[in-house]
Amino acid sequence: MIFGISDDDLWFPNPYLGDEDGLLAVGGDLSVERLLLAYSNGIFPWYSFRDSDMCHWYCPLSRFVIFPDEIHVSHSMRTLMNKGVYDVTFNEDFHGVIRNCSQLRIDEKGAWLGPDMIEAYTRLHELGCAVSVEVWEKDSEAQGCARHLVGGLYGVVIGAVFIGESMFSLVPSASKLALIHLAQTMRVNGGRMIDCQLETPHLKSMGGRHIPYEEYMKIMRRASDRHDAPRPVQQEGRE
């Protein structure tokens, strides 16, 4: 069953009542309050802004996640990391990351990262509830500290859980590098889980696996109920 919700109603139906693809509700706004309520319950927005002016809310009952302790770093990625070709930072260029994520998807069928979504996640970022990871390529021919943004990812933070929203790579393996640094930083800072939302071969090869919604919510509640819950990522600066 798919429910309709209005901008004035700050609620979501029981996730177990959604359809087999996880679609739970249609409608509602992208306010900070609604987004945080959604993410705290494993619900996320996803819709084609060119095909519909109504937000679609999903909550799959099988969740694809990566636990920071289980991140798989391949031999080729270790070699790349040891070369020191790239710098990885947190929250240095949230706008650049989300802009690149949206640009890579602008021509895709069902593109979802439109102006309304960008504005909504920017508001979350300004409140410290959305963070970015940037991968910079150093310019060896330039003097000083010249570098270029070549990859990254961003997502929402709920307590010690990171919900990944999108990633991009302008050079091979840049998004993998961002994800590895995210997981390693979460492990040090007490982060519990990375919600990948959707399974891809790329994420599965890096340690992603499915867990049931019940287990997901147990982790989410433990990670968000604590008043002293550690931040899963650094708020700014280099890793």
What are these regions, as identified by a protein language model?
Residues 1-239:
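N-acyltransferase acceptor-side catalytic subdomain
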